[in-house]
């Protein structure tokens, strides 16, 4: 079993987006700690299976971030289940988890399931609209969510998601200071080695996604953060 607490860098691939064999090879051979498959819309059983089968040729951890029950399948090392803390719709707090347990509860290996306390911060992102997230958050709001995740819910991961834009470093820093047990994931807008280095100095783990499809060379440079420690 892999130890996710040792992961510093994750590449996130969207099964609804095309990636060439050469680019996928470069991503999987880049020394990233893991590959995560996940997306907001058009995530289907077929495109998840297709992408998973292409990645499974490589000896690195593979994660499915669950966005709908239809695309859940065996064959992943971990299943990340988001609970969107700032969603105004209870379905995104525990609805996916409830349906997953009703459907697969008898066969779930809970050692493979990681619950993420998600906070969506970009109002213009697809995920914010889809989850009906209240993104008008102050630093104090984020600190309170961090305390909630760390001390009350005791979730293993808190994911600060800016999805498409580079986040407010001071707010991410404030969250980090309130997490003593929970692992902090940051994702959103990382498009350069400099940004990756800046966020990796605060978050335990950075998630790099969109830039893969825009500039593969810049995406690969973000892995260099592993050469230094937090």
Swiss-Prot record:
Known cofactor(s): Mg(2+)
GO biological process: glycerophospholipid biosynthetic process
Enzyme class: transferase
Similarity annotation: Belongs to the GGGP/HepGP synthase family. Group I subfamily.
Catalytic activity: sn-glycerol 1-phosphate + all-trans-heptaprenyl diphosphate = 3-heptaprenyl-sn-glycero-1-phosphate + diphosphate
One Gene Ontology term of the molecular function aspect: magnesium ion binding
Keywords attached to this entry: Lipid biosynthesis, Lipid metabolism, Magnesium, Metal-binding, Phospholipid biosynthesis, Phospholipid metabolism, Transferase
EC number: 2.5.1.n9
Binding residues for sn-glycerol 1-phosphate: 12, 159-164, 189, 209-210
CDD domains registered for this protein in UniProt: PcrB_like
Species per Swiss-Prot/TrEMBL record: Staphylococcus aureus (strain JH9)
Gene3D superfamilies, per the entry: FMN-linked oxidoreductases
Oligomer status and interactors: Homodimer.
Record's protein name: Heptaprenylglyceryl phosphate synthase
InterPro entries according to UniProt: GGGP/HepGP_synthase_I (IPR039074), GGGP/HepGP_synthase_sf (IPR038597), GGGP_HepGP_synthase (IPR008205)
Pathway entry: Membrane lipid metabolism; glycerophospholipid metabolism
Residues reported to bind Mg(2+): 14, 40
Domain of life: Bacteria
SUPFAM superfamilies: FMN-linked oxidoreductases
Function text: Prenyltransferase that catalyzes in vivo the transfer of the heptaprenyl moiety of heptaprenyl pyrophosphate (HepPP; 35 carbon atoms) to the C3 hydroxyl of sn-glycerol-1-phosphate (G1P), producing heptaprenylglyceryl phosphate (HepGP). This reaction is an ether-bond-formation step in the biosynthesis of archaea-type G1P-based membrane lipids found in Bacillales.
